[in-house]
Amino acid sequence: MPYFDYASTKPVDERVVEAMLPYMTEHFGNPSSVHSYGFKAREVIEEARGKISELINGGGGDIVFTSGATESNNLALIGYAMRNARKGKHVLVSSIEHMSVINPAKYLQKQGFEVEFIPVDKYGTVDLEFIEEKIREDTILVSVQHANNEIGTIQPIKEISEIINGRAALHVDATASLGQIEVDVEKIGADMLTISSNDIYGPKGVGALWVRQGVRLQPIILGGGQEKGLRSGSENVPAIVGFGKAAEITAKEWGEEAGRLRRLRDRIIDNVLKIEESYLNGHPEKRLPNNVNVRFSYIEGESIVLSLDMAGIQASTGSACSSKTLQPSHVLMACGLKHEEAHGTLLLTLGRYNTDEDVDRLLEVLPGVIERLRSMSPLYRR
């Protein structure tokens, strides 16, 4: 069954599962314990930390393990703002961030911080002039994702870093970009970077926040003081081992894989845009190699997804974290689409196990689905 919902979740690579298994049964020690079982657990955690740091060129900072990207984003925004509030209370956040950034930003507003949301153009690229105009003496934090999980647009993070020029901390959510494009904290100038295990075919329930040396955070989960006091709770050793193995594999394979996915992506886009009144969302060139986000006039994306599912093809209308709401995507609305346009969107995200045959099947089925749904729409007239 062709699966085109890799942005929502990915299967765990079998090599990762194999690496994890001994730490579920045989090597089950608590890394805080002062005996050989604990020492073994601590050793493999630090080994994984090193592999993940190497993947993002993170030698100039520390990897803090969390339960996932959502927690990492909360720690970055709330933890940094609360710790550095004496320096200022002005924060800039891109308007198309994942909700795990948007909602912490709104929480900060309730705590007395002034949060301004950075607008984007029709492709979802942030307005650099807005950042340049709005950054001021009391600005302490700017948060812009590396690439958008819904429309695939890659942001000019290096240019943003140059505009900030050390006047505020720069947080970058790289959850969607890791494993798809190069993620190098030094090249882009990030001070904090959010990443997730499952997005590189590791286990769910573990992520990390990379924190540059000298950046100070207030912990948001209190307890035994694990992870250098920034994230209490006994470390999830098997998951961290899996994260490390996934990072090791990604470091070796992402370039070749990205090229293969880009070829499949372009084939889908070229053929789908031949359908009458279909449009590409996101940047036509500066986009993730696995992302296809298209909209079709006169029909709803949810109907397309359900119809594809009946044909054995899995797809999405947008972020799985927000898919239970009937509201149009805040990302597409920020790009200037109307409600009805945003509701007519289909999101196809490719991954490691997609084949040319999967794409063949999609391109065989999708035009008929669109034609059938439009034939039932009172808005559509040939």
Curated annotation (Swiss-Prot):
Catalytic site: C321 (cysteine persulfide intermediate)
Binding site for [2Fe-2S] cluster: C321
Glycoprotein as UniProt keyword: no
GO CC annotations on file: cytoplasm
Record EC number: 2.8.1.7
Keyword terms: 2Fe-2S, Cytoplasm, Iron, Iron-sulfur, Metal-binding, Pyridoxal phosphate, Transferase
Residues reported to bind pyridoxal 5'-phosphate: N149
Keyword Metal-binding: yes
Annotated GO MF terms: 2 iron, 2 sulfur cluster binding; cysteine desulfurase activity; metal ion binding; pyridoxal phosphate binding
Residue ranges that the Swiss-Prot or TrEMBL entry lists as coiled coil: none
PANTHER family tied to this protein: CYSTEINE DESULFURASE (PTHR11601:SF34), CYSTEINE DESULFURYLASE FAMILY MEMBER (PTHR11601)
Additional note from the record: In Archaea the pyridoxal phosphate cofactor is not covalently bound to Lys but ligated by other amino acids.
Protein family according to the UniProt entry: Belongs to the class-V pyridoxal-phosphate-dependent aminotransferase family. NifS/IscS subfamily.
Job description of the protein: Master enzyme that delivers sulfur to a number of partners involved in Fe-S cluster assembly, tRNA modification or cofactor biosynthesis. Catalyzes the removal of elemental sulfur atoms from cysteine to produce alanine. Functions as a sulfur delivery protein for Fe-S cluster synthesis onto IscU, an Fe-S scaffold assembly protein, as well as other S acceptor proteins.
Protein name: Cysteine desulfurase IscS 1
Organism: Archaeoglobus fulgidus (strain ATCC 49558 / DSM 4304 / JCM 9628 / NBRC 100126 / VC-16)
